[in-house]
Amino acid sequence: MVSGLTVAEIRKLAGSRAGLDEDFLRALACDKRAGVAEIYRRLKRDENKMAAEAERLQKLYIYENSLIAQGYSPVAGVDEAGRGPLAGPVVAAAVILPPVADLALAGLNDSKKLNPSKRAELAARIKKVALAWSAGISTVEEIFNENIHAASLTAMRRAVLKLKIRPAYLLVDGYRISRLELPQLALTGGDGLSASVAAASILAKVLRDRLMDFYHVQYPQYGFNRHKGYATPEHLAALERYGPCPLHRAGYRPVKNCGSRQKCEG
């Protein structure tokens, strides 16, 4: 099967992943050429990695599969991003994934464990694979008026209500969502335990980061595009120098300690 091919031709074929069935791999294993042996070892390593990733993804569906087996379908995962920053809104997302683990979502994980480029890549894939997804936002004013916990729940509630498919059950990171008549399970560390919650955490984080990049254009002196509103030394120094702007959370102590909001209005 491969004896009539050069090592370069086999390498090109392996790179394209075309026709890489078990017969092809067995033929590579029997080929005595050193170059072919190296190609075979690389393909087997890749195969083993994909098998391990498929197993890891399947474990992330334990909660979803259990609920579906009990008759709850579809299941939505819900999470938020932006509880801790000194500036900007809190953003939530709700995601309904297909009931079967999909290697198109290889690398799916808690958004905090992924770098920005990986999060953006996965967010695009999640939107393609998901049966439904949506986002909800609570503004800086709502955070001030309600407190951050209540505002986070409001953002999550909005995300759920915007889903085009009504979920039968919710898996929520951290806390149950009040004033929502749907059965739900709050999972501590849910973005590392549930595929749909992990997907929601990624969408919420990517959307919020993009909003903060947009706000950076309006208020470049704070560096929102770098720290996304969190209390980094750069951000605290900018607050001390310029005072708060309308995006800052007036109820947060570091913001209150930096003087009048009027310094940066407009």
UniProtKB/Swiss-Prot annotation:
<feature type="binding site">
    <location>
        <position position="80"/>
    </location>
    <ligand>
        <name>a divalent metal cation</name>
    </ligand>
</feature>
<keyword id="KW-0255">Endonuclease</keyword>
<dbReference type="GO" id="GO:0030145">
    <property type="term" value="F:manganese ion binding"/>
</dbReference>
<keyword id="KW-0464">Manganese</keyword>
<comment type="similarity">
    <text>Belongs to the RNase HII family.</text>
</comment>
<dbReference type="GO" id="GO:0004523">
    <property type="term" value="F:RNA-DNA hybrid ribonuclease activity"/>
</dbReference>
<comment type="function">
    <text>Endonuclease that specifically degrades the RNA of RNA-DNA hybrids.</text>
</comment>
<feature type="domain" description="RNase H type-2">
    <location>
        <begin position="73"/>
        <end position="266"/>
    </location>
</feature>
<dbReference type="InterPro" id="IPR036397">
    <property type="entry name" value="RNaseH_sf"/>
</dbReference>
<dbReference type="InterPro" id="IPR012337">
    <property type="entry name" value="RNaseH-like_sf"/>
</dbReference>
<dbReference type="InterPro" id="IPR001352">
    <property type="entry name" value="RNase_HII/HIII"/>
</dbReference>
<dbReference type="GO" id="GO:0043137">
    <property type="term" value="P:DNA replication, removal of RNA primer"/>
</dbReference>
<dbReference type="Pfam" id="PF01351">
    <property type="entry name" value="RNase_HII"/>
</dbReference>
<dbReference type="GO" id="GO:0006298">
    <property type="term" value="P:mismatch repair"/>
</dbReference>
<dbReference type="InterPro" id="IPR022898">
    <property type="entry name" value="RNase_HII"/>
</dbReference>
<keyword id="KW-0479">Metal-binding</keyword>
<feature type="binding site">
    <location>
        <position position="173"/>
    </location>
    <ligand>
        <name>a divalent metal cation</name>
    </ligand>
</feature>
<keyword id="KW-0540">Nuclease</keyword>
<dbReference type="GO" id="GO:0032299">
    <property type="term" value="C:ribonuclease H2 complex"/>
</dbReference>
<feature type="binding site">
    <location>
        <position position="79"/>
    </location>
    <ligand>
        <name>a divalent metal cation</name>
    </ligand>
</feature>
<keyword id="KW-0963">Cytoplasm</keyword>
<dbReference type="GO" id="GO:0003723">
    <property type="term" value="F:RNA binding"/>
</dbReference>
<dbReference type="GO" id="GO:0005737">
    <property type="term" value="C:cytoplasm"/>
</dbReference>
<protein>
    <recommendedName>
        <fullName>Ribonuclease HII</fullName>
        <ecNumber>3.1.26.4</ecNumber>
    </recommendedName>
</protein>
<keyword id="KW-0378">Hydrolase</keyword>
<dbReference type="InterPro" id="IPR024567">
    <property type="entry name" value="RNase_HII/HIII_dom"/>
</dbReference>
